[in-house]
Amino acid sequence: MEKTSLKLIFLFSLTVIAFCSSLGDAREMVKAEVNCIGGKCPEGKKNCNCMPPIAHVMDDIRPCNTDGDCYKFCPRECELGTCYCRCDYGCTCTC
């Protein structure tokens, strides 16, 4: 009986330790994301694991023949030269 209780206590302690260590990792990750400015690491900071900017997508069902026909439908949020369009059953553009 005592051996079983000791085993259970040991397993419970390991579970608590594993859970607490995973919380520490999550806190470090949040700190890293807070340090990002505009999706980039600020000056002097390295490896801040910035999240990529959200991709803007524009779908248009107007007929097209080539990908080049679709560039006029680039989302307004795209910076010059960052828009990629394709023609599949209508235009789909993203940046």
Swiss-Prot record:
Q: What GO terms fall under cellular component here?
A: extracellular region
User: Origin, by domain of life?
Assistant: Eukaryota
Question: Any signal peptide, and if so, which residues?
Answer: 1-26
Q: Where in the chain are disulfide-linked cysteines found?
A: 48-95, 64-83, 70-91, 74-93
Keyword annotations of the record: Antimicrobial, Disulfide bond, Fungicide, Plant defense, Secreted, Signal
Give the protein name, as stated in the record.
Answer: Putative defensin-like protein 262
Instruction: Tell me which species this is from.
Output: Arabidopsis thaliana (Mouse-ear cress)
Q: Name one process (GO BP) from the record.
A: killing of cells of another organism
The record's similarity note reads:
Belongs to the DEFL family.
Q: Where in the cell is it found?
A: Secreted
